[in-house]
Amino acid sequence: MGRVSGRSCIVTGAAQGIGRAIGEALLDEGADVCFADINESKVAAVAEASQDRAAAGGGRVTHSPVDVTDRATVQAMIAHTVDAFGKLDVKFNNAGVNKPMNFLDVTEDNWNFIMGVNGLGCLIGMQEAARQFIRQGTFGKIVNTASVASRQGYDNVAPYCASKWGVVALTQSGARDLAKHDITVTGFAPGVVATEMWEQVDRDLMDIGAAQHPGQAMEEFSSVILKGRVATPADVTGTTTFLASQESDYMTGQIVMIDGGMTLV
């Protein structure tokens, strides 16, 4: 029996990168998983590719489109998951975006885009998951994706840093407010992870003149990682599966750093 057998989970931002890896790792440990993403065709393909993995782990898999900034689509995603699996136990608020800009060039549009997905999207996801847990009258878990950028600010990504500090605040505030409903709220903070999102960030930094060649940003960040390398999504999923499992049922309000030693807190 797997570590999360019988638990019904939603993972947003699951069409690629960390989100996809979280969902696949949950399937390996017996969970029922809804992969959700704004890119419906891509997340549908991920769910289809995960069918054999689900069967091997003893769980089930489905998918749902979602715009995490649109409450109606978040509600529809949760309803679909409950229809498919009979309940919801764990909600991963993982969808996130970044768009580097020099500090003096940050626009209202840039700020609102990043804060919308990373901040408001996290809030809506937490609220709607909590409402479902309360309707069920069951214990529930909310797991939020923060970042190493939630512990200190970095140049050229000020709105992203602010949004991830916001995720930490939402995690702590939600943990306090929702404890009376037997709902826990935790999070994890990855450092530099080799994903499609980081590849795009690398290109964006070159576009604004903050990097001169491909891979420069990742090289500079990795130079201060005590483990001596950037992470892969697989480096993150041991912790995320733990946060979804009964092994972490007594944890709430905490953010777990998974950054290879970039920050020591």
PLM segments and residue spans:
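Conserved glycine-rich Rossmann-like NAD(P)H-binding loop of the short-chain dehydrogenase/reductase
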Residues: 29-46
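Short, small/polar-rich loop/turn modules that mediate ligand/substrate recognition or access, typified
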Residues: 179, 184, 251-253
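Substrate-binding pocket helix/loop in short-chain dehydrogenase/reductase
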Residues: 102-103, 110-112, 221
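Residue(s) in the substrate-gating loop at a strand-loop-helix junction
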Residues: 147
